[in-house]
Amino acid sequence: MEKLTEKEKELIRVSWESLGKDKVPHGVIMFSRLFELEPALLNLFHYNTNCGTIQDCLSSPEFLDHVTKVMLVIDAAVSHLDNLHTLEDFLLNLGKKHQAVGVNTQSFAVVGESLLYMLQCSLGQGYTAPLRQAWLNMYTIVVAAMSRGWAKNGEHKTD
Ligand code: HEM
């Protein structure tokens, strides 16, 4: 696993904390952007609620639960910046689960772009080039582990 510099860790920790305790509204900004960039992802959420339009989906409790889960994973990564490898098994498993529900690894990159978009909206002037790079580096580590799990699950299915 790649390592982050101490400066990058500091930028990530301080900016994440500055978003406040309730991360869900920031997650909603992130997913609104994701669906703008890749509307087909809406179809992967097979909840009872009608997820026909972006607005229907974004306001459904099940969907907000998923947003909460995503923010908790990011929160776990931010809390483990010194030892991200301890999340490896969890992230492998998460990648496997997403392979099973039909998410492509290319979409993980679009999630990354949406995460940066959310940070830009939420941090305003605080969104600087080094901060952007720090988050991108962390997200790349998380997604690399998820993608390894995704690939393992894919292999399994074709055995
Ligand atoms: C490409 C965009 C994504 C789509 C379309 C997607 C879709 C889904 C779906 C359909 C489920 C199963 C239903 C549910 O639990 O709500 C799920 C579960 C989950 N997702 Fe995602 N997801 C995406 C990205 C992510 C990302 C980036 C993370 C975290 C970094 C994440 C974290 C989770 C977690 C923690 C679960 C619960 C897994 C479990 O049941 O153990 N998802 N996702």
UniProtKB/Swiss-Prot annotation:
It is found in: Cytoplasm, Cytosol; Mitochondrion matrix. GO terms for biological process: cellular response to hypoxia. One of its GO terms (molecular function) is metal ion binding. Residues 3-151 form the Globin domain. It holds the Pfam family Globin. Its EC number is 1.7.-.-. GO terms for cellular component: cytosol; mitochondrial matrix. The keyword Methyltransferase does not apply. It catalyses: Fe(III)-heme b-[protein] + nitric oxide + H2O = Fe(II)-heme b-[protein] + nitrite + 2 H(+). It is an enzyme of class 1 (oxidoreductase). Monomeric globin with a bis-histidyl six-coordinate heme-iron atom through which it can bind dioxygen, carbon monoxide and nitric oxide. Could help transport oxygen and increase its availability to the metabolically active neuronal tissues, though its low quantity in tissues as well as its high affinity for dioxygen, which may limit its oxygen-releasing ability, argue against it. The ferrous/deoxygenated form exhibits a nitrite reductase activity and it could produce nitric oxide which in turn inhibits cellular respiration in response to hypoxia. Belongs to the globin family. This is Neuroglobin-1. The gene is ngb1.
